[in-house]
Amino acid sequence: MSQVSLIYLFLLFSIISMNLAGPIKRTLHYEEKCNNTNWTTMYLRADGLNNTLHYIWDFGGKPSILMALTSLPTTLNITCEDFALKKNHSIVFSDNPIYTIGIVINKIIEFNDVNNTAVINYANTKNINVLKSESFVWSRKSFTMNGDSFGLNMEANFYNDTTTNITRRGSIKASLKGYYFLEHTDSIPHMLHTENSMLVDLILDKIETNETFSSSRFAIELMIVDGGNPDKLMIIDPKKNLDDEHTPGIFEVVEVRTPGFNRSNETQQNCAYLQWRPVSYLSTSRSISSSTEIVQYPPFKVNDRVAAIKNSMLYGYYGQDVKDVLVQTILISFGSKDDGFYKSTNYTTWTFIIGYGTPPDEQLSYLVILIISIGLGLPVVIMFLAALYAYIRNMSKRHTDTYLNR
């Protein structure tokens, strides 16, 4: 079989597999917990055929997300008074979850990139400012939900750290979206989501910088709390893509996987992942011309796990039990050499996916397959027509020679 034929078979198999691999859809249910319009807490459950994904978001204290996979009948109970005080086990499920993962926006870090490297230099602490995420004042801007998707938009317009007397103006916008089918998100960078994942889009807009810093850049530290093996580090795995159809100019997806762990038989089992494309946009247009790079740093284990989650919603669920689970941080900084620093546009974005289970793999779209097919098929058609022309011309010449020989 020729190489061209093999490629055509591969393209045909890709189209068939995309049509057969229908995702399992979930049904969304919004439940009001602790009815108080001033609260910045939201709860959703997404029911599948055999299990339920619970989502809790809280922006009081450190902004945090809890995802829990449970059996279908499992319900959530929040003791509102205790939860407001961030007390131990104020969040309880009626049955033990199959798996949980918590994400905390732990810190917003401003660093003075005096050497224009776009990398944080921890050796010089004078060039680093840590903004506590719990000192931002958040408000809910909008919440939308339909049969197979939801959207929550939060915004913080003021920073006030009472312990240090530091205040900052500017806006941090957080958009959380879930789509319960396999598809790319509708906004750039068009991340691939599944029915078991959600998207987080963060925007740092006109954040007031340190007056003594001439070359300010920003970084975000996430803290991950996971039921996996606490002794293993999370895995950071950059993956190359075949094309940049969904995110122009970007041929890579950075993937962070948690080390799944089943204590009963000590086998790797449940796990979660984060995914993002290594690009940050410097304007609302989110075009290639207004983009810069993202730098990811190795994960770090958190030593005092209880203290780390104390001022977040996650303490209300894990409590003292957090000592026995994985708690690690990852740091992401924004910018590249000679991009003008944060002050060039005073606008920076970061978009990432949080998901349960196996991360989805990018597939060639119908458009790309069509273009490849045309690119491969056209030369074959030309070769066939040329061969047919040569054959007809040769047969015609033979017929003429035979006639003359008579």
Model-derived regions: residue spans:
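N-terminal hydrophobic or amphipathic segments with adjacent small-residue motifs
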Residues: Y8, I15, L367-I371
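Extracellular/luminal recognition modules and glycoprotein regions
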Residues: G22-Y43, G355-E362
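Extended, non-transmembrane interaction/recognition domains
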Residues: D47, N51, Y55-T358
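C-terminal single-pass transmembrane alpha-helix
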Residues: T349-R406
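N-terminal signal peptide
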Residues: S2-V4, F10-K33
